[in-house]
């Protein structure tokens, strides 16, 4: 039976949050943000194990205050993140063992749904690469250097990509290695495989699947969590 591994990337410092603590460890309704993220993969029966990518100086804290405290035993490997997200993902990929599909997910994106996880695995098996996201609601403009609007993009052609981004393991590992060798810098993992001619299937995510990045995101996160609990 093929195995599926979630790589949860939580090594970023989150400087936009303006706190002394990493954003993944900020409490949301009494529990760390990272707990909610890991718990979704822990409880999903399609996920066999989790590789967690952390900053070196936060590994001990996370083990004691998140993994042991909440009994998150699907986390089989903890690896040290790199200077960039790209380096952190490669570290996570190198720790994966015997998995056909990997799901790369932001540690600060705690409202992932089972349906999104299942669809990501399904489409990655079919097409090699998949990513969830949502249609853009606002009008998007291209801004010129002088501050004036240069162009208006067609909203119906735009898609705000989220995580997890899901791949056949060999495909994403080989593309990341090539990108590192070729000095190609990317902002997400779908861009890595696209750089080498591979198509990515985009499927429906959720507007609740937000990434908590700034202080303004915390009240929204609390509201989403409250709604989830009452459903």
UniProtKB/Swiss-Prot annotation:
Q: Which UniProt keywords apply?
A: Isoprene biosynthesis, Nucleotidyltransferase, Transferase
At the top of the EC hierarchy, this enzyme's class is transferase
Q: In which pathway does it act?
A: Isoprenoid biosynthesis; isopentenyl diphosphate biosynthesis via DXP pathway; isopentenyl diphosphate from 1-deoxy-D-xylulose 5-phosphate: step 2/6
| Site feature: Transition state stabilizer | 16, 23
Q: Which EC number applies? A: 2.7.7.60
Q: Which reaction does it catalyse?
A: 2-C-methyl-D-erythritol 4-phosphate + CTP + H(+) = 4-CDP-2-C-methyl-D-erythritol + diphosphate
Mention one GO biological process in which this protein takes part, according to its record: isopentenyl diphosphate biosynthetic process, methylerythritol 4-phosphate pathway
Q: Where is this site: Positions MEP for the nucleophilic attack?
A: 155, 211
Gene Ontology molecular functions: 2-C-methyl-D-erythritol 4-phosphate cytidylyltransferase activity
Q: Sorted alphabetically, which Pfam families does this protein's record hold?
A: IspD (PF01128)
Q: Which family does it belong to?
A: Belongs to the IspD/TarI cytidylyltransferase family. IspD subfamily.
Primary role: Catalyzes the formation of 4-diphosphocytidyl-2-C-methyl-D-erythritol from CTP and 2-C-methyl-D-erythritol 4-phosphate (MEP).
Q: What is this protein called?
A: 2-C-methyl-D-erythritol 4-phosphate cytidylyltransferase
Species: Clostridium novyi (strain NT)
């Amino acid at each position: 039976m093929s195995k599926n591994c979630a790589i949860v990337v939580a090594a970023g410092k989150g400087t936009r949050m303006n706190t002394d603590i990493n954003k993944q460890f900020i409490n949301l309704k009494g529990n760390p943000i990272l707990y909610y993220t890991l718990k979704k993969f822990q409880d999903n029966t399609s996920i066999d194990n989790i590789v967690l990518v952390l900053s070196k100086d936060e590994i001990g804290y996370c083990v004691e205050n998140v993994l042991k405290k909440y009994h998150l035993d699907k986390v089989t490997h903890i690896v040290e993140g790199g200077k960039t997200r790209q380096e952190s993902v490669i570290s996570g990929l190198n720790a994966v063992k015997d998995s056909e599909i990997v799901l790369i997910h932001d540690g600060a994106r705690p409202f992932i749904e089972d349906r999104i996880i299942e669809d990501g695995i399904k489409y990655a098996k079919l097409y090699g690469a998949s990513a969830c996201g949502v249609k853009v609601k606002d009008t998007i403009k291209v801004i010129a250097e002088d501050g004036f609007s240069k162009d208006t993009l067609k909203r119906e052609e735009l898609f705000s990509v989220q995580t997890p981004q899901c791949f056949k393991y060999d495909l994403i590992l080989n593309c990341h290695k090539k990108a590192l060798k070729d000095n190609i810098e990317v902002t997400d993992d779908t861009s890595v495989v696209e750089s080498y001619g591979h198509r990515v299937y985009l499927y429906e995510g959720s507007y609740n699947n937000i990434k908590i990045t700034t202080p303004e995101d915390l009240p929204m996160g609390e509201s989403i969590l409250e709604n989830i609990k009452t459903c």
